[in-house]
From Swiss-Prot:
Enzyme Commission number: 3.5.4.36
Cofactor(s) in the UniProt record: Zn(2+)
Organism per entry: Pongo pygmaeus
Catalytic activity: cytidine(6666) in apoB mRNA + H2O + H(+) = uridine(6666) in apoB mRNA + NH4(+)
UniProt lineage: Eukaryota, Metazoa, Chordata, Craniata, Vertebrata
Family listed: Belongs to the cytidine and deoxycytidylate deaminase family.
Binding positions (Zn(2+)): E60, H98, C128, C131
Note on cofactor: Binds 1 Zn(2+) ion per subunit.
PROSITE patterns tied to this protein: CYT_DCMP_DEAMINASES_2
Record keywords, A-Z: Hydrolase, Metal-binding, mRNA processing, Zinc
Molecular-function GO terms, alphabetical: cytidine deaminase activity; metal ion binding; RNA binding
Pfam families tied to this protein: APOBEC2 (PF18772)
Protein name: Probable C->U-editing enzyme APOBEC-2
One CC-aspect GO term: cytoplasm
């Protein structure tokens, strides 16, 4: 009975995550799906320190980093000059939809035409082609939105589809930058929940500057 319930739960999880339902007779595949939680978008004000240290690290080969972490700052300014500011982070879990799309669905689902929006994202990796397309469409119909995206790594930058998507982002008015060591420190101070007894000072990893320069050069070559 328990196995049937687990199989039913796995079927539902597979459906939500876009898995092939024909493979559920495979015991190993079934075990994998049972262990896979349903898709969800996690939101909050501060992310755990161990998540930041692993997911945001600007390594050249991002093996195992199959989530997107997006920290955001939203500043909405009215005609009188008053600024309403908010910040937080999103994390996608086993998702077909990504954190970039979730931002526009949950954090800023609508834009007040009387306000000017300045939005800054600090993202663990650059957008995929589908997310870039969503961003471009949002920018094209929202003239009072300015978006700056700072990324720790470039996602699959060798692929022509990704390169074209990044170029189109620039053409749409989106500012795209690689995170400098100072940007990682800013995220650490403002978006990370430091562990008890841990130093609140940001401790840069050994190759942080070298990897920043590596990705900065790649992005410049793509966008030139």
């Amino acid at each position: 009975m328990a196995q049937k319930e687990e199989a039913a739960a796995a079927t539902e999880a597979a459906s939500q995550n876009g898995e092939d339902l024909e493979n559920l007779d495979d015991p190993e595949k079934l075990k994998e799906l049972i262990e896979l939680p349903p898709f969800e978008i996690v939101t909050g004000e501060r992310l755990p320190a161990n998540f930041f240290k692993f997911q945001f690290r600007n390594v050249e080969y991002s093996s195992g980093r199959n989530k997107t972490f997006l920290c955001y700052v939203v500043e909405a300014q009215g005609k009188g000059g008053q600024v309403q500011a908010s910040r937080g982070y999103l994390e996608d879990e086993h998702a077909a939809a990504h954190a970039e799309e979730a931002f526009f669905n949950t954090i800023l689902p609508a834009f007040d035409p009387a306000l000017r929006y300045n939005v800054t994202w600090y993202v663990s990796s650059s957008p995929c082609a589908a997310c870039a397309d969503r961003i471009i469409k949002t920018l094209s119909k929202t003239k009072n939105l300015r978006l700056l995206i700072l990324v720790g790594r470039l996602f699959m930058w060798e692929e022509l589809e990704i390169q074209d998507a990044l170029k189109k982002l620039k053409e749409a008015g989106c500012k795209l930058r690689i995170m400098k060591p100072q940007d990682f420190e800013y995220v650490w101070q403002n978006f990370v929940e430091q562990e008890e007894g841990e130093s609140k000072a940001f401790q840069p990893w050994e190759d942080i500057q070298e990897n920043f320069l590596y990705y900065e050069e790649k992005l410049a070559d793509i966008l030139k």
